[in-house]
Amino acid sequence: MPFIYCITNGNKKIHPSNQLILAALKEQFRDEFQIYNSPDTSAAIQRIHSLQQTCTHLIGVGGDGTFNVLVNGVCSHPNPAFRPILGVLPNGTGNDFYRSAGFQSTHDFFEKIQSGTFDLFDVGKVQTEVETRYFANITDIGFGGAVVLELPSAWTTSKDAHELVE
């Protein structure tokens, strides 16, 4: 039986369609499903580092930044054998990784978890003298975040923007 651990951005409201998916996962997997509302990136990575081999699936509810936190938490995990199946429910601004993974709807995501199927993806590594970071679909040096900050909030929170990934 899989053990599914879900990390959400505790500072962001979860879209209603994702709330339904989380409720369905909780109902199906019961004690094998837990949700952690992370207050920030470092808390999320610390929580991922505390997970053990019993965690078979790690799901983020967010966008590319949330998925990046999952990738960095798993790749920097103290136990290099810790490699749960990663997933993301789109609750971000761009949701590029979710779209590039070929999901047409959050229902597709739910069915993939139920069926136990998954796809492999490449992870890149950037190592400096100060730190090591990992990335799955894109890396930048801060410009991407600046663009998101400049977007009108109506565009990033509108129903139409979320339906782009549903």
Q: Locations of the language-model features?
A:
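ATP/NTP phosphate-donor binding region
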Residues: 1-61, 68, 72-75, 103, ...
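Short, active-site-adjacent cap segments at secondary-structure transitions
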Residues: 66-67, 96
